[in-house]
Amino acid sequence: PGAAQSCPHCGKSFAGRNPGGTLPVGTVLAGRYTVGEMLSIDGEGILYRGAENLGRFRVTIKEYLPITLTAERTAESTLRPKTGSEVLFKTTRMDFADLYRSIQRITPANGLEAVLDVVEANNSVYAILENLGGTPLDQWLENHPGTIRPDDACTMLQPVFEGVAAMHKIGLVHR
């Protein structure tokens, strides 16, 4: 993959670095998406800030990277599965791609982050997600201590319920 020197969205220099084992800041995927800083990591993969290079807007990039099945990332950014885990790595990689392609078909459903693209590269899969900004629920709760009235909670979470219902309609189960 190529590497950009600055963000195509805001022009800011890519001076920062991501931790070892993650994609380097400035990596370009499919000639269209630039990887920014790592936001979080979980057992399924890594979440990065990103930018769409043509329309120059922000995106979030979710990379398939199952920690328990991945041995390393090569110097060329290619994921290498652990010895003996090759079949499971490939199967779960295909499941990850299928999941995000399914969500892409039902978005924009209320309450779901739109999946703009699914890119396969580096022996991995990247879900390119709409980045609307906003405040994560844990931060909102931290800034608004105390009890939330049930009616207010239902109003706030209604889009989430609708998104999960849309997923269930096509046979996806939220875990």
Name each model feature, range by range.
Residues 16-35:
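A short, low-complexity linker immediately N-terminal to eukaryotic Hanks-type protein kinase catalytic domains
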Residues 36-42, 47:
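Protein kinase glycine-rich loop
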Residues 51-58, 65-69:
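Conserved N-lobe loop of protein kinases adjacent to the ATP-binding glycine-rich P-loop
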Residues 74-105:
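AlphaC helix of the eukaryotic protein kinase fold
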Residues 117-118:
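Activation-segment/catalytic-loop signature of the eukaryotic protein kinase fold
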Residues 121-136, 140:
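Conserved short submotifs of the Hanks-type protein kinase catalytic core
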Residues 156-157:
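Activation segment signature within eukaryotic-like protein kinase domains
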Residues 160-172:
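Protein kinase catalytic-loop region centered on the HRD/HxD motif
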